[in-house]
Amino acid sequence: MTSPLPRTRERRPVPRAERALAWVLRVNGAVTVTALLAVFMPVGWMGAVHARLGLGAAPDGPMFEYLARTVSALYAIHGGLCFVLSTDVRRFGPVITYVACAELAFAAALLLIDVKAGMPAAWVMVEAPAVVFVSGLMLGLRIVARRRERDATSD
């Protein structure tokens, strides 16, 4: 005898790699979305941060403010994207793979830019390696989750 109720899709437990990937995306999003503060930060504060980092006086003119605000806005957008991707890492898997690979390429560009621009050694030693760590973790977890998903469907 069949049930008169419609069939519901079985809910499989979320694999550990997918849960970990979602958390990495959330933490990445939480960190990068804070760049939104710099979009609205007074220029005087930007100058103070510039000096505090040992970079001397901030340059005068609109280009410094424009670049600081637009780069900060892009980081904040990236943070929002990470939050969205964390809501369904299986469905957004291909996008997560793209973002992780793009971030790895971005880390290489950051390293070159940081060195060429003469950024402080501590900055150079932290920025690009941090991006490599987070994006590498994202990519590794995505690969593990995808492999486990493939193994589960082949059973």
Regions found by a protein language model. Give the residues of each.
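Juxtamembrane helix-break-helix junctions at the cytosolic face
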Residues: 80-96
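Core segments of alpha-helical transmembrane spans in multipass integral membrane proteins
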Residues: 34, 61-84, 100-105
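Hydrophobic transmembrane helix segments
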Residues: 31-66, 72
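Membrane-water interface at the C-terminal end of transmembrane alpha helices
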Residues: 132-155
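Hydrophobic alpha-helical membrane segments
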Residues: 96-111, 130-135
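Cytosolic juxtamembrane helix and N-cap/initiation of the first transmembrane helix
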Residues: 2-35
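Membrane-helix boundary connector in multi-pass membrane proteins
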Residues: 108-126, 143-144
